[in-house]
């Protein structure tokens, strides 16, 4: 008997059935596609193609959760672009949640096979307390529907497991380089498109007839109070200018941290990293967002001082870090000069808007009001609601409540303030705010302890910018508004980057591309 001709029971019966089913599927797909083409329904045709692509991605993600994570991040960043051109389709909106669920399932299967490392976050107890209280708030009697609670749980906690994914993501230094290379490529693409849109106006990268829900978000112009110049606030690949501006802050921090890492590790890639930082800096300036400009400028000062403090204690290392900071400042200045030479009107109009609304000498300065008075007033407004001790329920004042009310026909709550801390009080009462502050402090403090352990190592610049991003998002950003934390891009990157931060002390440094006389890692210690 020859093994090559051996057949198995049922094989001869199943193959014709599978072939017949495949033929039927192909014929049905061809029929539907031809219908869409004849009817001119290109949107439906695009959805069919997108669905098929997602199916292929799911199979690949189940086989390799690390590649699946990169697919998820790419979808996360470019999902809004599809939403804009498909009439704000809610099926597209939930695509990222489906993909991250596939990542979780694949990751869980790998953990069951003992293929990955799992760690216990030192802030796990404060985090679980806040999660427990959030689950209880789903059943708050003041909430008009449990669907608001489901929305709140998703916005607050759905991406928290990414911390474990981030911790297990890297096995070698090459994995780290790959992760940040991919993310910087996506960031420079988004920044470049946003800069082009700032110059060309809202007709670029936006549909001719956007959906009613997102029309105003994609066509927002601001007027300088003195000169009267009009500037457009670009959205790039996102549906709103605020999401683009907040992503630019994150992208700038990542680019600055990776640049510091390359300074201590390798001469390769420094020039490219500087060019990426220049493009992102131009995106920040052209975003038209005063918050993005101020937070990026402040972060540059803080990170520069931190890099000097965390430089390796070797002869000449502090000088090299100082030169790197000077190079970064020169790159930022070069980006401004290039934009000025190429598109002077686009730059000067935004400079006029920034100076007329932020300069303390300007009669129309809003700096003190927007930084101190307005957020504080909105926070105190939360205590004018009679249920401030108990709240109305998680999700009742969150991002996206209008979709729950409209699509699911749920009675609107009509509550909320712009302050993020105030929104937490409205949703979960004063106890919820206290638990949020405890959790936030625990997360940031744990991150700071890791950063101190990284002092003197090549990982320090990356570690510090992750710590700084976590601090900004959990404290000042959320105090001003709940939207930054509930922004799915910032939320997903927060927990993913925190997991990466906790992995850095145990990540081995490869001998490849090491600068002669470069810094050595401190003694390896495992996180428990």
Predicted regions and their residues:
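A membrane-periplasm/extracellular boundary helix in multi-pass inner-membrane enzymes
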Residues: 192, 197-204, 287, 292, ...
């Amino acid at each position: 008997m020859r093994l090559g001709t051996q057949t198995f029971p049922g094989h001869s019966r199943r193959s014709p059935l599978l072939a017949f089913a495949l033929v039927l599927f192909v014929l049905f797909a061809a029929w539907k596609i031809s219908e869409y083409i004849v009817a001119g329904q290109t949107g439906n045709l695009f959805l069919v193609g997108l669905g098929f692509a997602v199916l292929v991605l799911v199979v690949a993600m189940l086989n390799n959760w690390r590649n699946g994570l990169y697919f998820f991040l790419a979808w996360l960043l470019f999902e809004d672009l599809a939403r804009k051109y498909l009439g704000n389709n809610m099926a597209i909106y939930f695509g990222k949640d489906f993909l991250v669920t596939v990542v979780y399932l694949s990751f869980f299967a790998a953990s069951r096979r003992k293929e990955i490392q799992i760690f216990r976050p030192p802030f796990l107890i404060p985090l679980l307390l806040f999660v427990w209280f959030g689950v209880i708030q789903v059943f708050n009697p003041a909430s008009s529907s449990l669907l608001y609670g489901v929305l709140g749980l998703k916005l607050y906690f759905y991406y928290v497991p990414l911390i474990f994914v981030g911790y297990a993501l890297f096995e070698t230094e090459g994995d780290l380089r790959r992760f940040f290379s991919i993310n910087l490529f996506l960031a420079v693409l988004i920044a470049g498109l946003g800069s082009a849109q700032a110059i060309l106006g809202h007709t670029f990268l936006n549909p001719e007839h956007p959906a009613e829900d997102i029309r105003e978000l994609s066509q927002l112009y601001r007027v300088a109070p003195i000169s009267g110049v009009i500037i457009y606030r670009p959205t790039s690949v996102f549906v709103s200018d605020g999401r683009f501006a907040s992503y630019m802050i994150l992208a700038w921090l990542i680019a600055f941290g990776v640049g510091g890492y390359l300074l201590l590790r390798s001469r390769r890639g420094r020039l490219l990293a500087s060019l990426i930082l220049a493009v992102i800096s131009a995106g920040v300036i052209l975003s038209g967002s005063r918050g993005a400009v101020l937070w990026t400028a402040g972060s540059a000062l803080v990170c520069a001082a931190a890099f000097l403090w965390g430089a390796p204690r070797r002869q000449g290392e502090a000088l090299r870090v100082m030169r790197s900071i000077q190079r970064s400042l020169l790159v930022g200045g070069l980006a401004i000069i290039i934009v000025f030479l190429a598109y002077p009107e686009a730059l000067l109009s935004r400079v006029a808007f920034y100076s007329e609304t932020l300069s303390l000498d300007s009669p129309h300065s809003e700096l003190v009001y927007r930084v101190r008075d307005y957020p504080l007033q909105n926070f105190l407004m939360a205590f004018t609601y009679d249920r401030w001790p108990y709240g109305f329920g998680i999700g009742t004042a969150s991002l996206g409540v209008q979709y729950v009310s409209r699509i699911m026909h749920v009675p609107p709550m009509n509550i909320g303030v712009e302050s993020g801390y105030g929104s937490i009080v409205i949703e979960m009462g004063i106890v919820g705010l206290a638990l949020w502050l405890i959790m936030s402090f625990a997360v940031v403090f744990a991150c700071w302890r890791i950063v101190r352990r990284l002092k003197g190592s090549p990982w320090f610049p990356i570690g510090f910018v992750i710590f700084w991003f976590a601090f900004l998002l959990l404290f000042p950003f959320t105090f001003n508004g709940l939207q930054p934390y509930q922004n799915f891009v910032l939320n997903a990157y927060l927990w993913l980057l925190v997991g990466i931060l906790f992995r850095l002390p145990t990540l081995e440094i490869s001998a490849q591309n090491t600068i002669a006389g470069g810094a050595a890692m401190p003694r390896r210690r495992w996180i428990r």
